[in-house]
Amino acid sequence: MFRPASRCLASRFLAALLAASACFAGPVAHADPVSYHYASVDGLRLFYREAGDRAKPTLLLLHGFPSSSHEFRDLMPLLAGQFHVIAPDYPGMGYSEAPPAERFAPSFDKVTSVIEHFVASLGEPHLIVYMTDFGGPVGMRLALHHPDWIDGLVFQNAVISEDGVDPARRRRDAAITGEATEAKRALAESHVSLATALLLYRHGAREPDALNPDAWTNDAAALANPDSRRIMTDLQLDIPNNVAAFPAWQAWLREHQPRTLVVWGRNDPIFVPAGAEAIRREVPDAAIHYYDTGHFALEEDHDDIARQIGGFFAPVHVRGRIESVEGATVTVRTREGATQVLQLDARTRLAAVKPYDRARLEPGSYVGAAAVPSGAGLGALEVMVYREERRGTGEGHYAWDLAPGSSMTGATVTAVTAEPGGRDLDLRYGSETLRVHVPDSAPVVTYAPAGREDLVPGAYLFAVAAPGDHGQWRAGAISVEKDGVKPPL
């Protein structure tokens, strides 16, 4: 019924065809570079890391204590081929400003407000949110404030219930509940230390002596700053308010049933595996993966966690015929004979295709050719001819899912040779070349505009859909039949 997009390049081909603003991708891609930035948010200088194309689905990474976005240094390059990845440092942590007390009264509500305004300033109203440790309280508050922003959640050692917290830690949290006396503040501050950081990094790790010391060395810089230590101490004192908010977070999860992935270091000294199961109690379809490691699971298992995220949130291809349209809901009978429901929203991009005069195919044309092995070469199933401004879209040769064994080639035509029953196209992408035979029976098309009025029962469509709430699939881009021309992809 569904077919994951094969690679980001294949997805870019589709995105351009649909004139969509998003690039939809499949499995974890090659490493892409991470860039480093500062933003002014609520009068504070906030540091953040960024990777990937902003046209792709956005993955917001919310770090833990006493860490920073440095926690995601290995994860971000692995996901940048599929997602637009952003990872801010909270005020007083990492490279973000640590404002004095008169300028910033730390609490999880306040940190959430800063992150909320940061996300809004980037124009990112839809997010998959990755939460670890302190990221849980921030991410869940963000979800409660803006449920329409949330396209999915990843919990990594971040709790929503008390049974996910080690008993010794629960006793400590109870001891700092209530008015912040000097004794309570001293107890909270005793945990804001390099010793705590080392415990969280090393306890439960498979090979603690093989861990990269850059992690806790980076944290040590913030822990040595008096204003940073004060801010982190204030956040420790605010943890009882997170515990009080657990029922609201659980209710939100039960109501919205977001697409949820749980990746958990089972040897975490403070957040135990019962915390992962508690999430699945609220979201029964949540997927859980345990790792034989500690609190900072990414230190040892970033490769597999990246694979899990990429696979779990990968969009799917839906091909079929519209059965019904009710408001923003489109029901499709897929080509495999199944029923698939698609949800439309303001981000859904619509397009159609129209026939292209194959006699106009000439050297210099930029095309996307879906093909299958035929004889000693490739035989085209269809060819999309791009407008000049779309040159370079999805350039390369890669697997495609139109038919068994099919591939997609985005390339420039270097030669056209007339042959009986069709023509051969010599194609170049980068330094590579190949030949594709285009039979007269293969559709040759180009882009045409379309609107929601073209989504009518009986029309054929090709959609790229991403996971949404309640097990639904949100249509990011749709190519629909128009004027009798069916989308061949």
Residue ranges and their predicted role:
Residues 285-313:
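Catalytic active-site module of serine/aspartate enzymes centered on a nucleophile-bearing elbow/loop
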Residues 12-25:
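Bacterial N-terminal signal peptides
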Residues 64-67, 133:
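Active-site glycine-rich loops that stabilize anionic/oxyanionic intermediates
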Residues 32-38, 42-46, 51-54, 58, ...:
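Flexible "cap/lid" subdomain of the alpha/beta-hydrolase fold that forms the substrate-access gate
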